Design a protein with these regions (language model features):
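A small/polar active-site loop signature that marks catalytic segments
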Residues: 270-284
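Polar/charged alpha-helical tracts
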Residues: 68-72, 232, 278, 282
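Proteolytic maturation boundary segments
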Residues: 5-149, 295-297
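A generic local secondary-structure boundary/capping motif
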Residues: 36, 284-286
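M16 family metallopeptidases and their MPP-like homologs
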Residues: 1-25, 44-52, 123-125, 130-163, ...
Length: 298
């Protein structure tokens, strides 16, 4: 686009310098005044439209119903949002410190191998590929393959449900707030043959990243509100999923290639009724019960 339109392609440093110059010229009262022009109190510049699926039996919104919904929202008295952030550490009670029980240098590939007192294996390798970034991965053999086909729905939802859950004493929303200003993330996932933890951070936020990893092993917090929100998103997506020849063919090919393994059947809306949050959390505990099974690379 920049090449075709003959526009300059700014570097991150140049963009930062320009923003430093422009931001002081935009005080909050100027922004508020601009918003008043965009959102007129007289509603003179408002366009309301609705998109939905066209199918038999669908009840469609009318002009009157859309206008009423808008007017009702306008009439609501909304209290100012109060952002309550928990003022407590990510880990409430610090665990007993472990130890490095052995170290080995691998000169051929340029990494150091550590064995920790909990049995975990750690591979450390410093590179100059991307300054200021620390990449973290941990893996253990197992994964979905250890579970029966009757667990299919919970296994299919596992990754998303865990990412929507909280950690420690923090719900999913509270966790996002307490991590504001920090550049650290960790995820727990369950593919077919392994369980993985992965993350990244800046050097100054390494402790936060390791704390999050510790909590994924010891204290994933159940967040019913976030879980219900996720299930509703799945319902909407699966309900409106277009039945196409391509998707049917792909499902059949996948099912055949995996020897008719029931765990490979695509999710349907009715399957969501069998989703069990407690069981998903139990599976997470089972797969992270023994850190000695894991090899971590940093």
């Amino acid at each position: 686009s920049n090449y075709l339109e003959k526009e300059p392609l700014l570097s991150i440093e140049q963009t930062y310098q320009i923003m430093q110059q422009l931001t002081p010229m935009l005080p909050v009262d100027v922004v508020n005044e601009a918003m008043k022009q965009l959102i007129s109190l007289s509603d003179s510049n408002v366009v309301i439209y609705n998109t939905t699926t066209e199918k038999e039996g669908m009840v469609y919104s009318t002009e009157a119903s859309l206008k009423k919904a808008y007017d009702d929202a306008r009439a609501e008295k909304i209290e100012a949002y109060v952002d309550n952030v928990k003022q407590e550490p990510l880990i409430a009670e610090q665990p007993k410190a472990g130890k490095i029980v052995s170290e080995k240098e691998n000169a051929k590939f340029g990494y150091k191998e550590l064995t920790l007192s909990n049995g975990a294996r750690v591979l450390l390798k410093k590179t100059n590929l991307k300054e200021g970034e620390v990449l973290f991965n941990g893996s253990s053999k197992g994964g979905k393959s250890l579970y029966d086909a009757k667990e299919r729905v919970n296994l299919d939802l596992f990754n998303d449900v865990i990412s929507y859950s909280g950690l420690g004493n923090f719900s999913s929303t509270e966790l996002q707030k307490v991590l504001a200003g920090k550049n650290a993330n960790v995820n727990l996932s369950l593919p077919n043959l392994h369980e993985y933890v992965s993350g990244s951070c800046t050097p100054k936020d390494m402790e936060t990243m390791f704390q999050m990893n510790y909590l994924y092993f010891t204290n994933i917090k159940k967040d019913e509100q976030a879980f219900n929100s996720l299930i509703n998103q799945y319902r909407a997506a699966l309900k409106n999923k277009s039945p196409s020849a391509e998707s049917a063919l792909q499902d059949s090919v996948t099912y055949t290639l995996h020897a008719h393994d029931a765990r490979q059947i695509s999710l349907e809306e009715k399957d969501l009724d069998n989703a069990n949050y407690d069981r998903i959390l139990q599976i997470a505990k089972e797969r992270t019960a023994n850190a000695a099974d894991f090899t971590f690379t940093i």
